[in-house]
């Protein structure tokens, strides 16, 4: 069999077309344009590139991106003050604090200062807790993007055994919670897991979120599994050895073009949703 390609790039483009119409309607009905505020602290080139990509995504659908740049010397107190200022600004519908921030800043305190209704990147503890409990909150952009991709391709999760490899607070942990909420049976594996291969061999769905190139070997994955690779490394490879799975897996997310496009797309999607709730 040939694996179904879960094309995140195509889905992101389709969603952008739909979001453009939503934004046009909001502008016409309310006279306001949805705004995503992005905060970049310091001059890390990779972070600057990510912020630019998010700004470009906003432009493509007619949204505005409010870019807030702060120096590397910024203190926790100064960053908290800026976040509170954006929280209080009714024209701002979403707030993104670009990770990582300089080491002197308490990143967790700053994430948690973002108002729940503007936490469109799903980074607050409150938002994570509400999401895990099945209450209304915006999900972390990457795992939420994965869930949207699986849903778009009608991948069955109910009763399936999903193995998530990785436990980061912005990917592995929320991914496991979202899969659990979708009635999957979930196993979380990490750097201290013993017999990792044995766990993965049992999986109907494998999510690679470990941050190491091709760490998960193709022979560990059973025939007919759904394979989701959330990694990206130089050379265009992910966390999973994908090539040998092209004719064994039921479905795979390509690298690049699978999970990656869905991350920024979900951030924009959730910002438009926040604006719709505010502007009607």
From Swiss-Prot:
Its EC number is 1.5.1.5, 3.5.4.9. GO terms for molecular function: methenyltetrahydrofolate cyclohydrolase activity; methylenetetrahydrofolate dehydrogenase (NADP+) activity. Keywords: Amino-acid biosynthesis, Histidine biosynthesis, Hydrolase, Methionine biosynthesis, Multifunctional enzyme, NADP, One-carbon metabolism, Oxidoreductase, Purine biosynthesis. It comes from the Bacteria. Pathway: One-carbon metabolism; tetrahydrofolate interconversion. Signal peptide: none annotated. InterPro entries: Aminoacid_DH-like_N_sf, NAD(P)-bd_dom_sf, THF_DH/CycHdrlase, THF_DH/CycHdrlase_cat_dom, THF_DH/CycHdrlase_CS, THF_DH/CycHdrlase_NAD-bd_dom. NADP(+) binds at residues 166-168, 191. SUPFAM superfamilies: Aminoacid dehydrogenase-like, N-terminal domain (SSF53223), NAD(P)-binding Rossmann-fold domains (SSF51735). It catalyses: (6R)-5,10-methylene-5,6,7,8-tetrahydrofolate + NADP(+) = (6R)-5,10-methenyltetrahydrofolate + NADPH; (6R)-5,10-methenyltetrahydrofolate + H2O = (6R)-10-formyltetrahydrofolate + H(+). The keyword Amino-acid biosynthesis applies. Catalyzes the oxidation of 5,10-methylenetetrahydrofolate to 5,10-methenyltetrahydrofolate and then the hydrolysis of 5,10-methenyltetrahydrofolate to 10-formyltetrahydrofolate. NCBIfam families: PRK14192.1. Belongs to the tetrahydrofolate dehydrogenase/cyclohydrolase family. This is Bifunctional protein FolD. It comes from Saccharophagus degradans (strain 2-40 / ATCC 43961 / DSM 17024).
């Amino acid at each position: 069999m040939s694996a179904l390609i879960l094309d995140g790039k195509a889905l992101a483009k389709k969603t952008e077309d739909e979001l453009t119409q939503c934004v046009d309607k909001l502008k016409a009905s309310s006279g306001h344009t949805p705004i995503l505020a992005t905060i970049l602290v310091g001059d890390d080139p990779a972070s600057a590139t990510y912020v630019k990509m998010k700004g470009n995504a906003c432009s493509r659908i007619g949204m505005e991106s409010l870019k807030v740049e702060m120096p590397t010397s910024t203190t926790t107190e100064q960053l908290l003050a800026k976040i509170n200022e954006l929280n209080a600004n009714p024209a701002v519908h979403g707030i993104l604090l670009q990770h990582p921030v300089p080491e002197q800043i308490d990143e967790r305190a700053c994430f948690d200062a973002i108002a729940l209704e503007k936490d469109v990147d799903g980074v607050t503890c409150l938002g994570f807790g509400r999401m895990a409990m099945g209450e209304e909150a915006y999900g972390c952009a990457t795992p939420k993007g994965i869930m949207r991709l699986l849903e778009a391709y009608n991948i069955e999760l109910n009763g399936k055994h999903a193995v998530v490899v990785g436990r980061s607070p912005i990917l592995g942990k929320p991914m496991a919670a979202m899969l659990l909420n979708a009635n999957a049976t979930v196993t979380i594996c990490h750097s201290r897991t013993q017999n990792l291969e044995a766990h993965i061999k049992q999986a109907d769905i494998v999510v690679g979120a470990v941050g190491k190139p091709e760490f998960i070997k193709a022979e560990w994955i059973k025939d007919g599994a759904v394979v989701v690779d959330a990694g990206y490394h130089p050379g265009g490879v992910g966390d999973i050895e994908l090539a040998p799975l092209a004719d064994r897996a039921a479905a795979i997310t390509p690298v690049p073009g699978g999970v990656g496009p869905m991350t920024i797309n979900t951030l924009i999607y959730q910002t438009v949703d926040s604006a719709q709730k505010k502007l009607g």
